[in-house]
From Swiss-Prot:
This is Potassium channel Ftrac_2467. The keyword Cell cycle does not apply. Its main location: membrane. One of its GO terms (molecular function) is proton channel activity. GO terms for biological process: potassium ion transmembrane transport; protein homotetramerization. The six transmembrane regions are tightly packed within each subunit without undergoing domain swapping. Transmembranes TM1-TM3 are positioned on the inner circle of the channel tetramer and participate in inter-subunit interactions that are central to the assembly of the ion conduction pore. The RxxxFSD motif within transmembrane TM1 coordinates a network of specific inter- and intra-subunit interactions with other conserved residues on TM2 and TM3 and plays a key role in the tetrameric assembly of the channel. One of its GO terms (cellular component) is plasma membrane. The keyword Hydrolase does not apply. The record marks 35 as: Hydrophobic filter residue 1. It comes from the Bacteria. It catalyses: K(+)(in) = K(+)(out). It comes from Marivirga tractuosa (strain ATCC 23168 / DSM 4126 / NBRC 15989 / NCIMB 1408 / VKM B-1430 / H-43) (Microscilla tractuosa). It is a multi-pass membrane protein. The record marks 42 as: Hydrophobic filter residue 3.
Length: 247
């Protein structure tokens, strides 16, 4: 199967993939990713009446958001092992931590997705907002929600950066060329940037400068920083990689 993927449009043609054979680490990891999506499904109750059915449809968008985020994490995991094929103890440890965080992260992620979907659905008139089903949405509860989400996002991208750092430390053993070393360094920085945004949001939430809902609103809007940060970083690395390939 991996030999087929080597020719698929979308993979980096300038990187020699070393993980051409799927390992037991990846097989186990894929099972955990599948379990994470299964937990999302099991967290929803089976509708028994028409009212329950229409109510369950409110969870379609939150479910789609959660599945999309899990697939993004899975894809980055897949690309890492496809590039390097590492099976050493440190990589296994980091991979285990990643999977643990993912499973812990599933329920807070779905809760946040449902909560935001309810709010924005009401703002744009898509659904009639009913926040009562979330219990007391006090400032302290929203802070706890933002802290849980921030810790999960920060931990996941930090682990990815450490995994790429491990690959970089083993560059001689992996026989990485100059472009592959640059690509590995870029992946380290990209994941550090990805974990810096939830870290900033987490710090603002814990400091709580206003002591009211404005803090959690700001903490949430900070995640929009992903767009300009990753666009700028992508352009910088793209220019450097083109120069490197031309030399």
């Amino acid at each position: 199967m991996r030999k087929v993927f080597e020719t698929v449009v979308g993979l980096n043609p300038n990187f020699s993939f070393r993980g051409k054979q799927q390992t037991r680490i990846e097989t186990f990891s894929d099972a955990v990713f599948a379990l994470a999506i299964t937990l999302l499904v099991l967290s929803s109750t089976i509708p028994e009446t028409f009212e329950d059915l229409w109510a369950s449809m409110r969870d379609v968008i939150p479910f789609a958001i959660c599945v999309a985020l899990i697939i993004v994490i899975w894809y980055q995991h897949y690309i890492f092992f496809l590039k390097y094929g590492l099976q050493d103890k440190v990589t296994i440890l980091l991979n285990t931590i990643l999977l643990f965080v993912l499973l812990v992260y599933v329920y807070p992620l779905k809760f946040l997705a449902r909560f935001l979907s309810e709010i924005y659905g009401g703002i744009f008139g898509i659904i009639e907002t009913d926040l009562s089903r979330f219990g007391e949405y006090s400032h302290q509860n929203l802070k706890l929600l933002m802290v849980n989400y921030g810790l999960g996002a920060f931990a996941i991208f930090l682990v990815f950066s450490l995994m790429y750092w491990r690959a970089y430390k083993m560059k001689s053993l992996l026989d990485l060329n100059s472009y592959e070393i640059f690509d590995t360094k870029s992946s380290i920085i990209a994941n550090l940037l990805m974990c810096s945004v939830p870290l900033l949001s987490l710090i603002i939430t814990l400091i709580d400068p206003w002591g009211n809902f404005r803090t959690t609103i700001l903490s949430g809007f900070l995640y929009f920083l992903y767009v300009p940060i990753m666009i700028v970083f992508g352009r910088i690395t793209s220019k450097k990689s083109r120069r490197l390939l031309q030399d």
